[in-house]
Amino acid sequence: MPRFLQDDDDEIRSPFMDSLSERLLRARTVIISGEITQRLAARTSAQLLALSAEDEAPITMFVNSQGGHVEAGDTIHDLVRYIRAPVRMVGTGWVASAGALIYVSVPRERRYCLPNTRFLLHQPAGGAGGSAADIDIEAREILKMRDRLNQIFSTATGQTIERIEEDTHRNFWLDAKAAVDYGLVGQIIEQETELDGARGRGGKSTGR
């Protein structure tokens, strides 16, 4: 079994960490924690592809992230939808920005969170220097990204694009219950057994 669990700085390489990584993979569990980076996206993509190639049983992904690189989030979002094995998302801590983009890559019935999870949605931000032409190009790309993300979250939550745009014009925080009411979360769970009880609902959904 390949080893994937390691910190971004490669500071921790120990038999214990290797063993923990292998146990998580055997349990078909993927953890996304911290900033969404290209490196994290590459590691997570490798995990997803390896697990799906091995078995089509459900994969459980825990997301606890402050957000980060949108395109890195896109990579994981698309890979979750690409693989055959269904993925169940569990939000914990906070699920913000690009982390929320990853979280909504599965149908609502496979989106769970723990009771104290908080969610943050907002419009993408960017800064550009250089010539006026470069700044104009960057601004237009940000607008296209905003429209694309609004569509993704509208589809995922059932809210209108206009509502998403209005709500996320500034930082839009939701606690677990508010996230359920908004359509972002399917179910709040407190015990692992509640997720185990959902295994029978782990199949692919044609409505995503």
Question: Model-found features: residue ranges?
Answer:
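N-terminal organellar transit peptides
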Residues: M1-A98, V104-R208
